[in-house]
Swiss-Prot record:
GO terms for molecular function: beta-N-acetylhexosaminidase activity. It catalyses: Hydrolysis of terminal non-reducing N-acetyl-D-hexosamine residues in N-acetyl-beta-D-hexosaminides. Keywords: Cell cycle, Cell division, Cell shape, Cell wall biogenesis/degradation, Cytoplasm, Glycosidase, Hydrolase, Peptidoglycan synthesis. Belongs to the glycosyl hydrolase 3 family. NagZ subfamily. It comes from Nitrosococcus oceani (strain ATCC 19707 / BCRC 17464 / JCM 30415 / NCIMB 11848 / C-107). Plays a role in peptidoglycan recycling by cleaving the terminal beta-1,4-linked N-acetylglucosamine (GlcNAc) from peptide-linked peptidoglycan fragments, giving rise to free GlcNAc, anhydro-N-acetylmuramic acid and anhydro-N-acetylmuramic acid-linked peptides. It is found in: Cytoplasm. Pathway: Cell wall biogenesis; peptidoglycan recycling. This is Beta-hexosaminidase. Its EC number is 3.2.1.52. GO terms for cellular component: cytoplasm. GO terms for biological process: carbohydrate metabolic process; cell division; cell wall organization; peptidoglycan biosynthetic process; peptidoglycan turnover; regulation of cell shape.
Length: 341
């Protein structure tokens, strides 16, 4: 049995019979969690355990847990700083900033691993050009070298906790005003401008073994007519061919307005997978899941599984083990020294 190439979300804090049927479908290989699915560490651990028990290989469980304004689980978890705080510290003290980035990545990952989450969709590798409000303080910095240094440290911390990193939003969402949640942003810069700036963090980290990437719902008009997540040129020619990326590609949410031009949800999913995505992410469409899954017959693409299987979390631990871990205690104290976020 293979791991299916579709990741969906859930309605609430427990599984109902309809969701169990969705998750049991051969095309479904993962679940993304949101704040609406969370009440407490104990509750989310029980929910994830129920998801994992549904089938083998077990479903991947993911969440957006970057820190700052994008942290789905808050009460009972350490509040993490926005990436930009690390960037500001980098301008004053590069070594200290990289140390804090590593500790932040480890702390984020180890707390999620303690409730059973496999991976977070992080870190953000976009450059903060002072243009995009939806990216803004989610980005480490505006300069590629700073983003590379901080992201490498952050990813190292994640790996020590047993979590694979997902770099986003390839090839860079930081130079467009529009928010792809509500519109399709169009970036009119030249290939050279993108290649010599935004692409650099993705290139360096791809060559360092970045486990996964999420493409942007952005059209780079001077390069290709299709949004990146539906573009074989961007995903196969550039990301895999030119940058040497060997990890998994997971689409951004296909229910976003930035994906709407491709067609209905079935057309979007098929287009993303055909372009080179290993997994298609579909959120906030519970009424559409039954229709979508009914259209998907037979076994999905078995060749996608090897890259996806490398995203399973490692080094399982309990919350009790976490709380009694001196490294966790030191990390929480160190982060607290930088104030509330």
């Amino acid at each position: 049995m293979t791991l299916g190439p579709l990741m969906i979300d859930l309605k609430g804090v427990t599984l109902d019979s309809e969701e169990r049927a969705w998750l049991g479908h051969s095309w479904v290989g993962g679940v993304i969690l949101f704040s609406r699915n969370y009440e407490s560490p104990e509750q989310i651990a029980a929910l994830i355990k129920a998801v994992h028990a549904l089938k083998e290989p077990r479903l991947l469980v993911a969440v957006d847990h970057e820190g700052g304004r994008v942290q789905r689980f808050r009460d009972g978890f350490t509040l993490l700083p926005p990436a930009s705080l690390l960037g500001k510290l980098y301008d004053r003290d590069q070594r200290q900033a990289q140390r804090l980035a590593m500790i932040t990545g480890w702390l984020m990952a180890v707390e999620l691993r303690a409730v059973g989450v496999d991976f977070s969709f992080s870190p953000v590798l976009d450059l903060d050009r002072g243009v995009s409000a939806v990216i803004g303080d989610r980005a480490f910095h505006g300069e590629p070298d700073a983003v590379i240094a901080l992201a490498r440290a952050y990813i190292r911390g994640m790996a020590w906790a047993g979590m694979a990193a997902v770099g986003k939003h390839f090839p860079g969402h930081g130079s467009v005003v529009a928010d792809s949640h509500t519109a399709l942003p169009v970036d009119k810069r030249s290939w050279r401008q993108i290649r010599e700036g935004d692409l650099l963090p993705f290139e360096h980290l791809a060559r360092a073994g970045l486990p996964a990437v999420m493409p942007a719902h952005v059209r780079y008009a001077s390069v290709d007519s299709r949004p990146v997540g539906f573009s074989p040129f961007w995903l196969e020619t550039v990301l895999r061919g030119q940058l040497g990326f060997q990890g998994a590609i997971i689409s951004d949410d296909l229910s976003m307005a930035g994906a709407a031009e491709v067609g209905d949800m079935s057309a979007r999913m098929q287009a993303a997978l055909s372009a080179g995505c290993d997994m298609a992410l579909v959120c906030n469409d519970p009424d559409g899941y039954a229709l979508l899954l009914d259209e998907l017959k037979g076994d999905p693409y078995p060749q996608t599984s090897p890259r996806l299987l490398r995203l399973y979390g490692r080094y399982p631990l309990t919350r009790s083990q976490l709380y009694h871990n001196p490294a966790w205690q030191r990390a929480v104290q160190m982060l607290a020294a930088y104030g509330e976020f």
